């Protein structure tokens, strides 16, 4: 983890084992108290046990930082090691301060897993940081097939200084693709939706002869649909749980009748040209999770405008990226459903 790495870096310039060992202990202490907080925001005042561990960590790193400052060396290699240790220590101290005291414009939250939680500190608005560190110093060229119109404002660019070029697409979507919307299905919140959706999915996959990338907004929906289709269809069904992403995509590519069921991790970065991928099925509009700690804090900041400024743009971008898995070359054809 981060503090194990920091202990190693500091150990190259400080030889006192009580200091370097103390850094390694910070990681273990944080793991013990943050494991149950994964996926949650940390707001002041913190629970006592978390406050105690974070405060102890802050004091230990303060001692390390004081020791680093006191080191006087003329050796260039040692100077570089000292600088790196100070930089990493200072960054960790700053993050702990924000988590302990809170800081306007920042949010503290815990990511990772219960076994390996990570304390994260993120700005609610990246614009000032980007302006100071990038836009005021460099000319930048940003390219993507899915750049939202609001990007310049979101990342702190002066819109008067931004030039936008839309080069269009080399693909003839109208001639090579169809959009199928199963408007006859019941509301997704209705009890009978899943059974009807499975019937629809089975019919679509059969019509395509396999060759399907089915994308879901949750692992639960993916697992349920995959199990149901395995019992109904006489063709290979792979899921995102089966293999690492590169091997999974390769296995899907190698067998034309194979179907791949996946979640948000494969809404982008999947490039399978040709007949192997002829049908992309998307189970729901991929709105971001309401309990995402960073987005939740940004929603609180924006108030009533949050849905239109955060949720809709992100869902639109994810939907566009998912649909973009279908047509990868000028000769590809298929259906998005």
Where are these regions (language model features)?
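ASCE RecA-like P-loop NTPase motor cores
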Residues: 1-337
């Amino acid at each position: 983890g981060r503090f194990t790495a920091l202990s190693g870096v500091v150990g190259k310039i400080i030889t006192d084992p009580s200091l370097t060992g103390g850094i390694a202990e910070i990681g273990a202490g944080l793991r013990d108290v943050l494991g149950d907080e994964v996926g949650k925001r940390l707001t002041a005042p913190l629970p006592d046990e978390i406050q105690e561990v974070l405060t102890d960590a802050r004091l230990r790193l303060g001692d390390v930082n004081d020791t680093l400052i006191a080191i006087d060396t003329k050796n260039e290699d040692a100077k570089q090691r000292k600088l790196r240790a100070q930089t990493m220590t200072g960054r960790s101290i700053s993050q702990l301060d924000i988590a302990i005291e809170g800081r306007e414009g920042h949010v503290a939250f815990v990511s990772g897993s219960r076994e390996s939680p990570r304390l994260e500190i993120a700005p609610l608005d990246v614009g000032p940081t980007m302006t100071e560190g990038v836009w005021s110093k460099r000319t930048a060229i940003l390219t993507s097939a899915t750049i939202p119109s609001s990007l310049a404002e979101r990342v702190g660019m002066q819109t008067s200084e931004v030039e936008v070029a839309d080069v269009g697409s080399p693909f003839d979507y109208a001639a090579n693709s169809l959009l199928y919307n199963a408007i006859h299905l019941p509301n997704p919140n209705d009890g009978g939706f899943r059974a009807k959706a499975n019937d629809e999915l089975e019919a679509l996959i059969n019509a395509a002869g396999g060759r399907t990338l089915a994308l879901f907004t949750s692992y639960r929906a993916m697992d349920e649909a995959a199990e149901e289709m395995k019992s109904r269809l006489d063709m290979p069904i792979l899921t995102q749980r089966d293999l690492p992403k590169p091997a999974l995509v390769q296995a899907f590519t190698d067998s034309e009748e194979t179907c791949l069921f996946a979640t948000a991790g494969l809404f982008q970065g999947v490039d399978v040209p040709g007949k192997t991928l002829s049908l992309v099925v998307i189970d729901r509009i991929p709105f971001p999770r309401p309990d995402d700690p960073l987005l939740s804090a940004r929603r609180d900041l924006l108030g009533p405008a949050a849905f239109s400024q955060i949720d809709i743009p992100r869902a639109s971008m994810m939907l566009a990226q998912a649909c973009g898995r279908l047509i990868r070359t000028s000769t590809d054809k298929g259906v998005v459903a």
